[in-house]
Amino acid sequence: QFEAGSPVAVILASGDLTLGGVGTITRREGDRILAFGHPMLGSGSVELPIGSAEIVDVVSSYQTSFKLSNIGEVAGTLWQDSTPGIQGELGRIPYMIPISINSNAGIQNPISGKIAEHRQLTPSMALVYAAQAILTSKEGPDGSTIQGSMKLSLEDHEAPLELKRSGVGFGGAIDILFSFAEVVDLVLNGSQEFPRIAGIQFNFQTENREMSQILHSLRLSSARIQPGESVQLTITTRDRSGKAILHEVEVPLPPAPAGSSFTLFVADANALRSYDGIAKNDPSRPL
């Protein structure tokens, strides 16, 4: 084990879901190993887990042959990922982020494990882990309404960051997953600092019926608002049966001098998704 010619794994996720890349050890000196003969991701200096691996079979292909393998426990740290190969040290275990997913419709519940700490990989691994619960539910996401929440705990922060999203069907499930991954990415890459995530918790509640509504009409209490006042909105939506539902919404306005103008954007999910796709790179779009 961990000798020249034996397999080694770079572990991106462990626990109920295991993900990683497997290659061959080129050389070992003491607790240090050189492996792969090519980069894993080409990330340079990193702190990723490495562990044992077992090659089950080699699948031959004219296009790209590949190995079927099992990944074992974390046993060390990959600290250099460059063009000649990867370098790691056995015995030094890197930090991994605890993750758990609860779902009322999951085939397995809860799902828990750990994911690698990495600016680019952590958001993707969190998305993949959460997808195991939301996309592999007993009934599947099609025709269902999904309520999703994410709790992101940071070291040195008492209160966790909490986010809630809702969606209908497969498209709604994908929107929820990517919106959560975007927040994780923003936390890790939104500044020069690299905050340590102490844990990620997901919760998904699925109902086997579509609870979607479309926006039918909107009425403002007044188009002219005094400083410090709020905008009163009466919104009418309709469900799938055509039944009208009234919503009274109060929107506070930020302090501004007299004569200022504001743009308020109100949309249902389909319109908002289209609007985001068109105006994503427009800095002047209304909030």
Model-derived regions: residue spans:
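Terminal presequence/propeptide segments associated with secretion/organelle targeting
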Residues: 1-287
